[in-house]
Amino acid sequence: MTAIVLACVSAALFGAMTVLVRRALVTGVPPAAGTFLTIVPACAITGIVAGARGNWDVAAAWPYVLAGLLAPGIAQILFTFAVRDAGASRTSVTVGTAPLFAVATALVFLDEPLVAGLIVGAALIVTGGVVLASDRARPEHFLRIGLVYALIGTIAFATRDTVIRWLGTEVADAEPGVAAFVAMLTGTAVSLAFLAWTRTPLGRRAAIAFVPAGVCYGLSYVFLFEAFARGRVSVVSPIVATESLWGVLLSWLVLRKSEHVGRRLVLGAVLVVAGGVLIGVYR
């Protein structure tokens, strides 16, 4: 029961992070700055949690640098651009397709078995994606390039999940909290490098605007790792897959006027989440 609650909280916090990133971007903060300012508080939180456990064997967690390069590094940059251009709700639904890409890479590189549940889950996700693409009730700020950013970022998220799965079973034997901190610290370095490359300025008002999103992001990671530590993957993963629904629900509650959350968007989210749940159960 504890693992279920922790997984639900993690999913809800990730959905809240998406909405809070959108609210902060409305103030005019560039996505490059927004990415960095979201990851820094999250990195601090994961570091505090890892330190509180007293296990600082960072050497054992060095392979997770690769995972951090993918996400939150590259993926979070694309995610922030997607939220700016496509909106929080539509980005949430797109990110919800990550299990489809995770299964695809796992089938190819990890030789995981293909079962009927995975096929049905993949079909539901694809159907949800088609419904989302056919949704014409889009907000004024919507740009199609935002969905492209979201899709590429989702592939990075999914590849990260496969890498972590491989590292955790074949290579590294690191404490989960330290592994999360190393991945988040790497993501911070990537976002800082992108910030310097684009010569994007930082401001005090921008930093304050993104603190809530960063806190939600960091806590989401903490609760996620706690859930996996206390429960089976087959129980936790399907619940975590509901983060897309949380993103749509919170967008409707908080950003109702600007997001235009309609029936097609909700239907697409439900189909994508249902597919993600099936994939989580049958993996």
Regions found by a protein language model. Name each.
Residues 1-66, 76-86, 134-149, 170-172, ...:
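Membrane-interface interhelical linkers
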Residues 8, 12, 36-40, 65, ...:
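Residue-level signature of the transmembrane alpha-helical core
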Residues 40-46, 101-107, 117-135, 262-283:
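Hydrophobic transmembrane alpha-helices of multi-pass small-molecule transport proteins
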Residues 66-76, 80-129, 178-185, 232-253:
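Specific alpha-helical transmembrane segments that line the substrate/conduction pathway
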Residues 145-169, 177:
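Selected transmembrane alpha-helices and immediately adjacent juxtamembrane segments
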Residues 218, 229-233:
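Intrinsically disordered, low-complexity segments enriched in Gly and acidic/Ser/Thr residues
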